[in-house]
Amino acid sequence: MEELQRYFEIDRFRQQYFIYPFLFQEYIYALAHYYALNGSIFYETMENFGYDNKSSSLIVKRLITRMHRQNRLIISINDSNQNRFIGHSKNLYTQTLSEGFAVIMEIPFSLQLVFSLEEKEITKSHNLRSIHSIFPFFEDKLSHLNHVSHILIPYPAHLEILVQILHSWIQDAPSLHLLRFFLHDYQNSNSLKARKKSISVCSKENRRFFLFIYNFHVYECESVFVFLRKQSFHLRSTSFGTVLERTHFYGKIEHLVVVLRNDFQKTLWFFKDPFMHYVRYQGNSLLASKGTHFHMKKWKSYLVYFWQSHFCLWSQPDRIHINQLYNHSFYFLGFLSNVRQNSSAVRSQMLENSFLIDTSIKKFETLIPTIPLIGSLAKAKFCNVSGHPISKPARADSSDSDIISRFGRIYRNLSHYYSGSSKKQTLYRIKYILRLSCARTLARKHKSTVRAFLKELGSPFLEEFLMEEEQVLSLIFPRTPSPSYRSHRERIWYLDIICINILTNHV
């Protein structure tokens, strides 16, 4: 247990005791408003100032003051949100305080992030996103594994758990009391729904505050995977049993530790270099392994006990689903993914004897969820629930070029997002729906038929729906007879799809 405890403490920054006084400085709220308008990240701005790794309250104050002077933010009378500042609203005061509180709390974490990146000699860290590691995992690793566990990030049984987790990092009692006030205030006003929804799905006006709390909560939940990954890296040829026996799952409840010690004495041999693979996006996680189903059940019990004993998180066993990859499909990042076994027969001949050899190759597939995607188009009035295109009267007042541009942009975004799909037939159906819906909208505007309008408009209408990927591939692969044929077979992952990750909410 001492080794795991040292691990949890090794990367933690120096305890900050002077966070609360910053709440009485007006430039903090100007800075918070600036971040709300620009959506920037604190450590990206900090890199431009060139501060060293001596984090102290004086440096933090100078940093904020300098940023405030460079970004003179004056809320004018013509501000579109000026009506929010009329009167004395309790919600307004709470919102303003929480925004400033979130900015202040991000400072020490951002300082620690920048310094750790400098030690590892990682440059331009603001261009890196954790989502970029998911695509290589899908392509290179998943097809060689046997089982996958779909995990929902556990939620705290009580809001006080969030305060206690943060207390282990920052020992500033006034700030923790203020954090406790914010959480209970939003709970009473039904803005915080931590029972059934993610903490990040909260009031948009306080999104920065809840994103900070949620990201820190997820970071603590995932700390066990980082620890085990490091142990696996250093102990590839040794048994995991000694590690688990020594840590006792970092349990703080005495009877639980006794139960685990007695229960796992006979099964510690099972945790031999498990080759566990873990990826997460938003509130969904995947834990894949090459082990057996019994092996995955042991890991499921381990995670449930660990989260409940160490973090007091309400993690029910039914929030972790174990399935075999070769006969189960799962939703992730808006894709319907699975691993198929493609069988093929090869005829071999040796002297006068010939025989057939059956081979089976695992292939990872990412499919486009047709029914949910058509349901989203039907909800937006592009088609009916059966996928039959309909006109969109709301666009009839716009110009022809604007209507065509809007429909074409929607399709290009969809084709860009699902360019990593192994089968793109669904994209052609979506293209048909959007093209015909656009044509019917224009025909309705000009009081004409669809056939006559398409004949009059000609090729410019078709070019608007040409995928950008097809144009690029025609330059990269000039020998390919048809760029659309090439794009149909190629799987291309674009790393900027997080900009349109709202598509993941439709499945």
Curated annotation (Swiss-Prot):
One of its GO terms (cellular component) is chloroplast. Pfam families: Intron_maturas2, MatK_N. Keywords: Chloroplast, mRNA processing, Plastid, RNA-binding, tRNA processing. GO terms for biological process: mRNA processing; RNA splicing; tRNA processing. GO terms for molecular function: RNA binding. It is found in: Plastid, Chloroplast. Usually encoded in the trnK tRNA gene intron. Probably assists in splicing its own and other chloroplast group II introns. Belongs to the intron maturase 2 family. MatK subfamily. This is Maturase K. It comes from Asimina triloba.
